[in-house]
A protein has these predicted regions:
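Cytosolic regulatory regions built on CNB/CRP/Popeye-like sensor folds
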Residues: 1-168
Length: 168
């Protein structure tokens, strides 16, 4: 699958046409990467230098959460994302640090886009930035609702499937 086809399937790029997607694919930092089962893609607290688009496979997004009875932090599954999903979006939102840890749940193929490159593209082409930001807000809202449910119910790992908003 071409990089443009991968972006066409991604939830935050759905509002863009082929010429806009080509501008993203042509960024010097846009490249494909692969990760093996259980390989850490990034960790919470690291600088968010790249946006990731999942082309193939599944990725666990985990947060370190303490329980009411303990101050120890334990990894808590926030969601499992699949093909067409975006992760690593903090590269687009200051202060540009990852808040979750991403781990390959299977062998994965990812399209990686440099954060500074795509932010500069948004300044050059504000309509691209607007469309991506509008769609990104839906992704963030969905993940926020997931975290709310974890806090309200006290359940860990409440999502074991791809959320409905991915359309996959």
């Amino acid at each position: 699958m071409s990089a443009i086809e991968s972006l066409k399937r991604c939830e935050i790029f759905l509002g863009l046409d082929n010429s806009d997607l080509k501008k993203i694919v042509d960024l010097p930092s846009c490249q494909e990467k692969t990760y093996q089962l259980e390989e850490v893609i990034f960790r919470a607290g690291q600088p968010a230098d790249h946006l990731h688009v999942l082309v193939e496979g599944k990725v666990d997004l985990l947060a370190e959460v303490s329980t009411p009875s303990s101050r120890l932090l334990r990894p808590t599954l926030i969601t499992i994302i699949g093909k067409g999903s975006v992760f690593g979006w903090p590269t687009l939102v200051p202060p540009h640090f990852f808040s979750l840890t991403a781990i390959a749940k299977a062998p994965v193929q990812v399209l990686v886009i440099g954060g500074s490159d795509i932010r500069n593209l948004f300044q050059l082409y504000p309509h691209i930035g607007y469309e991506v930001t509008r769609s990104l807000l839906q992704v963030i809202a969905s993940r926020f609702r997931t975290i709310e449910q974890i806090l309200i119910t006290g359940k860990r790992s409440i999502l074991f499937e791809i959320p409905k908003w991915t359309g996959r």
